[in-house]
A protein has these predicted regions:
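Leucine-rich tandem repeat or coiled-coil scaffolds
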Residues: 1-86
Length: 86
């Protein structure tokens, strides 16, 4: 889902889907104009989704609060790959 401009509302919808998704292991939301609100929604979803192992949030509009929320959500998940730069 690279560069689709989903924004915070789209990220919130993706987060709801992640909460009940038993198969998706990698997700790229690279360059989608996602801000802190969207990142926080994704972070909440990651807390209940043990299947996802890689998440690319590079080149969005994440502030420190959004980045930290996602990092905190996966901090105890060994091997989780997270990209939040750009």
């Amino acid at each position: 889902m690279h560069n689709n401009n989903v924004g915070d509302d789209g990220a919130k919808a993706v987060a709801e889907a992640l909460k009940v998704n038993p198969v998706l292991t990698e997700l790229s939301l690279h360059g989608n104009n996602i801000g802190d609100d969207g990142a926080k929604a994704i972070a909440e979803a990651l807390k209940v989704n043990p299947v996802l192992t890689k998440l690319d949030l590079d080149y969005n509009n994440l502030g420190d609060a959004g980045k930290q929320a996602v990092r905190d959500a996966v901090k105890d998940r060994s091997g989780f790959v997270l990209y939040t730069s750009g």
